[in-house]
């Protein structure tokens, strides 16, 4: 069954408004009102990524902690709540995570590139997630309940919010660029139309038994 992410309560508990108008910030929380809850990694925004079925972003992130590819595939397909229960801390010792059999340093640029690609895939494939993110235009995104130490978590609040705002602003810029292109094309077409010669009405007159264009006849005089 599809989740009603715009509901005001869940399991008898009221969802909270996570937007602060004074600071113009939106706190990303699974128990927040829309769009805060849909932006949570626990939300079931399913997508495919590099051959893997991801039931949620939480599923993808938790799967990175497992070297066994079959276990990784299983966790990757899970919805958020179930995936979070599969969390382990063994990766913290050497800071190595895994993706499809490849070892990756958690603190490396390679890892940052991986999670950026995953979020981009979810953004492109999940209309629900994309719509929720674009509704936050102009807001600063935060995640107050996350762990800030990157050596202890698979994703910090800074990483999460940075990726989401980058996706949002890039998409918004692309939309505006396309709008400007379309306007430019329309204006150019209008200019071309205005430069077209006006069709002249041809009037024929009898010139000694020969029909002649009246305007052409005037030019001969």
Annotate each language-model stretch with its function:
Residues 198-221:
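Active-site neighborhood of HAD-like aspartate-dependent phosphohydrolases
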């Amino acid at each position: 069954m599809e989740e009603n992410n715009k509901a005001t309560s869940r399991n008898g508990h009221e969802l909270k408004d996570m937007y602060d108008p004074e600071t113009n910030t939106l706190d990303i929380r699974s128990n927040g009102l829309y769009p805060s809850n849909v932006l949570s990694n626990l939300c079931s925004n399913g997508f495919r990524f590099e051959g893997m079925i991801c039931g949620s972003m939480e599923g993808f992130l938790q799967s990175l902690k497992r070297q066994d590819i079959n276990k990784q595939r299983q966790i990757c397909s899970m919805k958020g709540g179930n995936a979070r229960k599969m969390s382990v801390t063994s990766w913290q010792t050497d800071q190595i995570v895994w993706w499809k059999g490849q070892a990756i340093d958690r603190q490396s640029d390679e890892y940052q590139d991986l999670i950026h690609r995953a979020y981009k895939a979810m953004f492109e494939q999940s209309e629900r997630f994309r719509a929720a993110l674009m509704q936050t235009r102009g807001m600063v995104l935060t995640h107050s309940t996350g762990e800030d130490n990157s050596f202890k978590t698979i994703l910090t609040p800074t990483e999460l919010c940075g990726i989401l705002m980058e996706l949002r602003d890039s998409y918004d810029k692309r939309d505006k660029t396309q709008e400007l292109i379309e306007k430019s094309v329309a204006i150019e077409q209008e200019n071309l139309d205005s430069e077209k010669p006006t069709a002249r009405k041809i009037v024929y007159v009898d010139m000694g038994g020969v029909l002649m264009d009246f305007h052409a006849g005037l030019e001969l005089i």
